[in-house]
């Protein structure tokens, strides 16, 4: 899980999701998981 100021899609399987006010990226590749913080 990467914590970044600006989250971006790294591939076409990445999806940007808002959960409880936190922007996250979910993907089939676990290395692409990100959270905005």
From Swiss-Prot:
Entry keyword set: Ribonucleoprotein, Ribosomal protein
GO biological process, one term: translation
InterPro entries: Ribosomal_bL36, Ribosomal_bL36_sp
GO CC annotations on file: cytoplasm; ribonucleoprotein complex; ribosome
Single GO term (MF): structural constituent of ribosome
SUPFAM superfamilies noted in UniProt: Ribosomal protein L36
Family, per entry: Belongs to the bacterial ribosomal protein bL36 family.
PANTHER family in alphabetical order: 50S RIBOSOMAL PROTEIN L36, CHLOROPLASTIC, LARGE RIBOSOMAL SUBUNIT PROTEIN BL36C
Stated name of the protein: Large ribosomal subunit protein bL36
Lineage of source species: Bacteria, Pseudomonadati, Pseudomonadota, Betaproteobacteria, Rhodocyclales
Gene for this chain: rpmJ
């Amino acid at each position: 899980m990467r914590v970044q100021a600006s989250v971006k899609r790294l591939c076409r399987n990445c999806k940007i999701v808002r959960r409880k006010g936190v922007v996250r990226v979910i993907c089939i590749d676990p290395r692409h998981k990100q959270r905005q913080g």
